[in-house]
Amino acid sequence: LGGDIIGKLAVPIIREGSGGYRATLQGTTEHIDSEEGLKALLDRLGLLGFYHKIMTEEEFRTLAADQAAVDGLFHTLARQRLEAWIELANSRLGGTGIRCFVTGGNDDYPNVLEVMKTSGSQVFIDCEGAVANIDEDHTMISVGNSTLTPWKTPREVTDEELGRIIDGMIAQVSDLHRCIFNFHDPPNDSTLDTCPELDWTTDPPTPIVKAGQMVMHGAGSKSVRKAIETHQPMLGLHGHIHESSGAIKIGRTLCINPGSEYGEGILRGGVERVRASLKVTGLPAPPISTRWLPSGAPI
């Protein structure tokens, strides 16, 4: 699992004096008068990856006036959700031999990701910053940082710094042809990174329009592309650019970005199968097969 782990929103649910509840979701204020309605709302919020906190009107006003308290609550809710996911993985995957390798993205705060590092889980594996042994033949290196964006997210670095991070990981790998490059930022100008070009001087950033058409550009990392072109790993796993799903080849390397439709409650991903190969020194890495749904959505 790779990508931004943290939710995009925390929704306050106001407990009203009448015994009902009030919440504003996606610009619409909803009034809820039953526990069944509240459960339905919580299910919708969970499907969207949002957090929630039930509070009184007075508690809401006090919280809204204190940005530090808002940030603290958001981080607490994010950590609690991640802890719940780890416990779910432990209960479902424990004893099966299946491991779930997980990395964050540029939106994730380090203090939230710390939950993964300290969980001690044997099935929910924080694989960022270390060489992960997928099996006895194949390894994976993971980097969740991205290059700079107009939103100034917590784990952005310059493309040059991203290149140094990647080079440090590559130096730890003995056989790069049997390695997976799990880098959140996609390779530059690869069609896995195509998105609207934004005007960074506006708040919020707005798409640049010329002749009535949005200007599109490749927003991925030049350092990621250089690493793939130079070392030709067996597979590149990427994300970051939500609207640019696809699978392409850079040399021998299959690179994939499943895209994201979190706003619609859709989880996108891919199934990659590494064919078995004989252990003979000098043989190339085994081929990769990718399976896609007829709609184009990866499975």
Segments (PLM) and residue ranges:
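Well-ordered, non-membrane alpha-helical segments in soluble/globular domains
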Residues: 75-89, 158-168, 272
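Conserved beta-sheet core of the metallophosphoesterase superfamily
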Residues: 99-102, 118, 122-123, 128, ...
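A short C-terminal boundary segment appended to hydrolase-like catalytic domains
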Residues: 172-175, 281-299
